[in-house]
């Protein structure tokens, strides 16, 4: 499933007609029209689970991720861990660059023991990609999280920070190249790298 909003759904429909994929592409319009009424990343996940009546394990890949690594190792490890949730991670060269991301610390079993959202002074160079494997038995925790109005629907990092205190969340460190292309500077750098 690819979730978008009313503003961009027609663009995605045009794209989907010519996209080459071994998987069926299903577009989902979250029915929002602008940033003021958007559901947020966690809200969109909840929306798709409910709308499509999902009852299977879920792989969530944020649309602003661009990476060269394979998902196979991540998925195999997530299923092997039999963990409620696994999260894709990337090790930056410089710790100071982690200020732009969610910063993670792992224990010896690769469980997430610390999560800081965009800290001024990162305690690690290991950062969160917007990449999650959620076991079907724990999809309901998204609803539990969203019931508390203080929790942020637009920040997946806030969900993980909350979730790691509820259940085990494992991290998987990707190798290769990764970009968060959420702004033009990094989008242009990614274009130079991948094109």
Q: What do the PLM-derived regions correspond to, one by one?
A:
Residues 66, 75-79, 111-195:
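Catalytic-core segments of class I nucleotidyltransferases/pyrophosphorylases
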Residues 105-111:
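Short acidic-glycine loop/turn motifs at beta-strand connectors
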Residues 69-98:
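Conserved donor-nucleotide/metal-binding helix-loop-beta segment in metal-dependent transferases, i.e.
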Residues 5, 63, 90-91, 174:
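Cofactor-binding loop segments of dinucleotide-utilizing enzymes, especially the Rossmann-like FAD-
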Residues 32-37, 95, 121, 178-180:
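A short acidic, often aromatic-flanked loop/helix-cap motif at beta-alpha or helix-coil junctions
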Residues 1-60, 66, 73, 183:
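Conserved N-terminal catalytic core of the sugar/cofactor nucleotidyltransferase
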Residues 2, 60, 87-88, 171:
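Structural beta-sheet core signal
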Residues 55, 82-85, 167:
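Short, high-confidence coil segments that cap the C-terminus of an alpha-helix
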């Amino acid at each position: 499933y690819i979730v978008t909003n009313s503003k961009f759904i027609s663009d995605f429909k045009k794209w989907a007609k010519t996209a080459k994929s071994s998987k069926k592409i299903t577009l989902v319009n979250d029915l929002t029209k602008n940033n003021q009424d958007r559901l947020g990343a966690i809200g969109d996940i909840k929306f798709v689970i409910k709308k499509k009546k999902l009852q299977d394990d879920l792989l969530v890949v944020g649309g602003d991720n661009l990476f060269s690594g394979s998902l196979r190792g991540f998925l195999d490890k997530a299923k092997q861990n039999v963990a409620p949730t696994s999260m894709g991670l990337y090790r930056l060269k410089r710790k100071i660059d982690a200020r732009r991301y969610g910063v993670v610390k792992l224990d010896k079993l690769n469980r997430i023991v610390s999560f800081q959202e965009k800290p001024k002074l990162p305690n690690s160079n290991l950062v969160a990609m917007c990449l999650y494997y959620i076991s079907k038995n724990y999809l309901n925790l998204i609803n539990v999280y969203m019931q508390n109005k203080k929790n942020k629907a637009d920040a997946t990092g806030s969900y993980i920070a909350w979730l790691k205190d509820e259940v085990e969340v494992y991290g998987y460190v990707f190798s290769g190249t990764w970009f968060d292309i959420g702004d033009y500077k990094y989008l242009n750098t990614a274009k130079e790298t991948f094109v």
